[in-house]
Amino acid sequence: MDLLNTLVEKGLRRELPSRAEALAVLATSDDDVLDVVAAAGKVRRHWFGRRVKLNYLVNLKSGLCPEDCSYCSQRLGSKAEILKYTWLKPDEASQAAAAGLAGGAKRVCLVASGRGPTDRDVDRVSDTIKAIKDQNEGVEVCACLGLLSDGQADRLREAGADAYNHNLNTSEGTYGDITTTHTYADRVETVQKAHAAGLSACSGLIAGMGETDEDLVDVVYSLRELDPDSVPVNFLIPFEGTPLAKEWNLTPQRCLRILAMVRFVCPDVEVRIAGGREVHLRTMQPLALHLANSIFLGDYLTSEGQAGKADLEMIADAGFEVEGADQVTLPEHRAPAGGCGSEQSAGCGSHEGGGACGSAPAPRTDEARTDLVAVRRRGAGTDLAPNA
């Protein structure tokens, strides 16, 4: 297929595909999905070999969020029966992190519900970061605390944080349809603050919220322009008790096409399969490792994930290897500066845009698999052992 050959060549050169090419990936048929995976897999292996980076989530504060993000089980007005608890103490968070690290994780992601941290919250998280780093040599720590105020990213960096996550989630044009309590521009500004403070920026998306192919391409191109080092790709977990509970729009093949498109647009960036992989990729999860070079180990913030042991077996059986703590995740040209930093330098590649945008046929809608959505009842915030 000429399209795929062209995209592989561009990916190996870190050249931005046209919008038409990105849309064409999403429009490929299920009959061609293995060809798409094989092509994007060449780009993935060129930049990341067969390594898979493991990340581990620690939910520092769960539920009771004042924001109205319609996809979120922790949102204002959510009826989802999730765990709700206030801030974990530093030693509790460090203990939770240790379980993930013992399971093979290289990075710990510290997440807290809410619009954004107060300065007191930043102090609290700083103590947690120091506790984790003191007890686990070489661990990477990423914070995800919401919208940042001036100076807070610098303070997190000084406390030892390596990265900051704040997802764009969807396109600017449809952002107001999923959230009204803050704006798309607010999210962009927070990613920029993380960059400016010298933190490795992590920013991604959520697929399956009813968006169009054009929306998906828009948000991935916006991410490319922001130049994060890591792009988590979430697949909506339709929690009962949230406005998007009935949005079952994804098939395993659709998820693979989305991951392939992200890999072609962001060829040398850590692409992470995040929330919802078990729900939507299901038995095709191993194929997704040919597209992404990073996953979350174990459970998510409010839902259960695949057993940690099963994650490790899946990686090995698919012919991949867990990235070690002594291995550098990013390609050499990105690693020294933590990203390209400018349109002219190397990093993620050229920032040109353009290209016609078409409209792909609506994807086939799978039967709602509510049986696969399990609320987390173990690990952080409970007395039960974590999944790692």
UniProtKB/Swiss-Prot annotation:
PROSITE patterns cross-referenced by the UniProt entry: RADICAL_SAM
The reaction(s) this protein catalyses: (4R,5S)-dethiobiotin + (sulfur carrier)-SH + 2 reduced [2Fe-2S]-[ferredoxin] + 2 S-adenosyl-L-methionine = (sulfur carrier)-H + biotin + 2 5'-deoxyadenosine + 2 L-methionine + 2 oxidized [2Fe-2S]-[ferredoxin]
Binding note for cofactor: Binds 1 [4Fe-4S] cluster. The cluster is coordinated with 3 cysteines and an exchangeable S-adenosyl-L-methionine. Binds 1 [2Fe-2S] cluster. The cluster is coordinated with 3 cysteines and 1 arginine.
CDD domains found in the cross-reference section: Radical_SAM
Region: Disordered, residue numbers: 335-371
Keywords associated with the record: 2Fe-2S, 4Fe-4S, Biotin biosynthesis, Iron, Iron-sulfur, Metal-binding, S-adenosyl-L-methionine, Transferase
Binding site for [2Fe-2S] cluster: C109, C142, C202, R272
One GO process term, biological-process aspect: biotin biosynthetic process
Keyword Transferase: yes
Cofactors: [4Fe-4S] cluster; [2Fe-2S] cluster
SMART domains: BATS, Elp3
Residues in Radical SAM core domain copies: 47-277
Residue sites binding [4Fe-4S] cluster per the record: C65, C69, C72
EC numbers: 2.8.1.6
A GO MF term: iron ion binding
Pathway annotation: Cofactor biosynthesis; biotin biosynthesis; biotin from 7,8-diaminononanoate: step 2/2
InterPro entries in alphabetical order: Aldolase_TIM, BATS_dom, Biotin_synth/BioAB, Elp3/MiaA/NifB-like_rSAM, rSAM
Keyword Amino-acid biosynthesis among UniProt keywords: no
Family: Belongs to the radical SAM superfamily. Biotin synthase family.
Described purpose of this protein according to its UniProt entry: Catalyzes the conversion of dethiobiotin (DTB) to biotin by the insertion of a sulfur atom into dethiobiotin via a radical-based mechanism.
Record text on subunit structure and interactions: Homodimer.
Name of the molecule in the record: Biotin synthase
Source species of the chain: Streptomyces avermitilis (strain ATCC 31267 / DSM 46492 / JCM 5070 / NBRC 14893 / NCIMB 12804 / NRRL 8165 / MA-4680)
Taxonomic classification: Bacteria, Bacillati, Actinomycetota, Actinomycetes, Kitasatosporales
